[in-house]
Amino acid sequence: MITQVTPRALLAPLCSPVGGALEGFVKEHSWGIFTEGEAFAGAEGRLLKWGTLAFGWLILHYLCGLNECLSLMNRNEYEIMAPVGSYESLMAAINAGADSVYFGIEGLNMRSKSANNFTTEDLYRIAAICREHGVKSYLTVNTIIYDEDLELMRRIIDAAKDAGVSSIIAADVAPMLYARSIGVEVHLSTQLNITNVEALRFYAQFADVVVLARELNMDQVAAIHRAILEEPILGPGGQPIRIEMFAHGALCMAVSGKCYLSLHEHGKSANRGSCSQVCRRSYEVRDKETGIELEVDNEYIMSPKDLKTIHFLNKMLDSGVRVLKIEGRARGPEYVDAVVRAYREAVDSYLAGTFDEARVEQWDKHLGEVFNRGFWDGYYLGQRLGEWTSSYGSSATKQKVYVAKTNKYFSKIGVGEFAVESGELRVGDEILITGQTTGLVRFTIEEIRVEMDPVERAVKGQVCSIAVPEKVRPGDRVYIFTDRKVAQ
């Protein structure tokens, strides 16, 4: 009986969606399968060579079942990319099932002034954390680049290569060219507004993954995907271009995000990472000659609702989208956790053939609990006009309220000790615990103890003990996740 085979080690190369990578791996590696401590096949009699790949599939079928292997192979074909603006969000993304994360460091990224940003030193730590967890790391270098930026651009990309970042995301030819010249993989940003096959053919010389314009509908995306496979249109890696598209989060009112409102109003360019969210304000529309205010549907005439695609995710994947990008580098870990977890479950459900309305309804509920401005389908299903939010700020059905910090964690019994610093904690409260290493832990309190005695609540100034489902750490912050009233 075969007793010493690791199924995941076998699955990794054999279930790769990339034929070239599969062939290279099999040609390069020996495969030893052992029985009862005795070599069944070793250095002198390798069972699996390039010419006997089919035998490997028989072994996989024996070990884990053909359906599971095919499911894992298919899952490797799809990627959920999560936004990261803090270490809390990074760990939340990883723990929720993200396949990759994208982030920026100081300067030359589209959130350099409007969201949390990491330093060059953080770059090495983030890349190491991602490698440790088997998650790809993408660095955004996606602003307009001027001549005076070129030296900084090269330093950033050099640091990305040195740190082992998986790829950069670019929207300007300068970083594309430089990254390729030093062997750094490039993904192309939605800022390029790629809407047709001719543009894709041109940009294929730079990148293996391309974000198509979010103004396209799914029929147009499917046509581009067919062209990629039929020609085929190959990236620098020699494989067909992979299509990436935004799946969830805030949308810009301008075409592919090329907005000039901030520059016009405040002298700060959104295309240089300094968006001041001018579009999110309420406005009155008046006739300049008469002073009469014109009646419009709502005051937020330039603030789009957020994109949500989970209810037609199957159509996106069927159309050829392979990388699902989630917007939200300025959002907290609770947002990242909820959105990544929902889309992870949705993709897995699609692959398992269990994607249905009941599950969509449950995912919708969880997505509505965290930051959003209301939802719409974007332009993906053929809608030509945008949908605008009716209120300022978030329409989330829940809000987090800070109440305590973590003092200790007792790993043997799975209990945390917490100092209540504001308000109170009650049995039945849903709470969030966040920290740079912890990421986010979300659960409902079943029991509280103060000085070993069970109580219904712990108030400001008290130290309490609560059973927690995952490890937490000293200094982690504790929030109540409670219902909120949404403006109508």
For each predicted feature, which ranges?
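Extreme N-terminal basic, low-complexity initiation segments
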Residues: 1-14
